[in-house]
């Protein structure tokens, strides 16, 4: 209501909505003479206001543009839609970006890194089992883990597996600068995957699962053919 009061005074030419497609149902009734741009940062089929085909037809009709963070997200939006929707110029993809920092590859350390929630959805259970085997075989390597997830309670212990807990973004970038191998082995369908993008931008060799928009984050990464401990271990060892 407060936004409507402000907007009735401002009379904006364009209104951006991020990740809340359900808001269009209300706004188009009260502010019908506006141009709307809707940004999807997550799976459209998992959100109120875009889960059904009728929801998405409504959005396509009432939005000036609909922006997706990956081709995968756009494909999800178009599931079950007509050819008119598929060919609509209203639908565009804008990938996220990351600063490509100057990194001296010679100064990279023998470090394998995992960044994210330490749960099954992110594949941390698979990663942990794989890197314990690596640490056992290669005594000069270390593993750094940044993140937490008290609900899943997945623990791996080794003197060269360093758990950093939650750290701020600047700390993550500093970690990537000295990391040689970064692993993003998610089970769930990542709408995009900023973690792998930033790892690559900071000179890491990156291993990813073939889930959601993750393959769109890299040009020269390693994509796991199978998402299991053996495959992760073998890809790390090869690198």
Protein language model features and the residues they cover:
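Short His-centered aromatic/hydrophobic patch
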Residues: 17-22, 40
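Short acidic/histidine- and often glycine-rich active-site loop of Leloir-type glycosyltransferases
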Residues: 154, 211-224
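Nucleotide-activated donor-binding/catalytic signature segment of Leloir-type glycosyltransferases, i.e.
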Residues: 152-173
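Short beta-strand->alpha-helix junction loop in the catalytic core
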Residues: 43-44, 72-73, 91-103, 150
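Acidic donor-binding loop of glycosyltransferase active sites
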Residues: 177-191, 204
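Conserved donor-binding/catalytic core segment of Leloir-type glycosyltransferases
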Residues: 67, 104-122, 128-132
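A short, active-site helix/loop in glycosyltransferases that binds the activated sugar's phosphate group
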Residues: 26, 49, 56, 61-88
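Conserved acidic donor-binding segment of nucleotide-sugar-dependent glycosyltransferases
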Residues: 221-230, 237-239
């Amino acid at each position: 209501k407060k936004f409507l009061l402000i907007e009735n005074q401002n009379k904006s030419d364009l209104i951006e909505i991020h990740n809340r497609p359900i808001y269009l149902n209300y706004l188009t009734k009260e502010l019908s003479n506006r141009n709307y741009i809707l940004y999807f940062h997550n799976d459209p089929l998992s959100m109120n206001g875009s889960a059904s085909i009728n929801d998405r037809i409504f959005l396509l009709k009432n939005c000036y543009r609909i922006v997706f963070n990956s081709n995968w997200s756009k494909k999800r939006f178009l599931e079950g839609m007509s050819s008119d929707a598929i060919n609509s110029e209203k639908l565009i993809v804008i990938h996220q970006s990351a600063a490509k920092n100057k990194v001296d590859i010679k100064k990279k350390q023998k470090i394998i890194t995992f960044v994210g929630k330490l749960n099954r959805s992110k594949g941390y259970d698979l990663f942990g089992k794989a890197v314990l085997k690596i640490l056992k075989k290669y005594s000069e390597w270390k593993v750094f883990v940044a993140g937490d997830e008290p609900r899943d309670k997945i623990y791996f212990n080794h003197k060269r597996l360093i758990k950093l807990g939650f750290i701020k973004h600047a700390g993550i970038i500093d970690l990537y600068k000295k990391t040689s191998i970064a692993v993003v082995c998610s089970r769930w369908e990542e709408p995009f995957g900023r973690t792998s993008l930033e790892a690559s931008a900071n000179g890491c060799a990156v291993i990813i699962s073939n889930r959601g928009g993750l393959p769109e984050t890299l040009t020269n990464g390693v994509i796991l053919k199978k998402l299991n401990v053996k495959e992760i271990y073998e890809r790390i060892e090869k690198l």
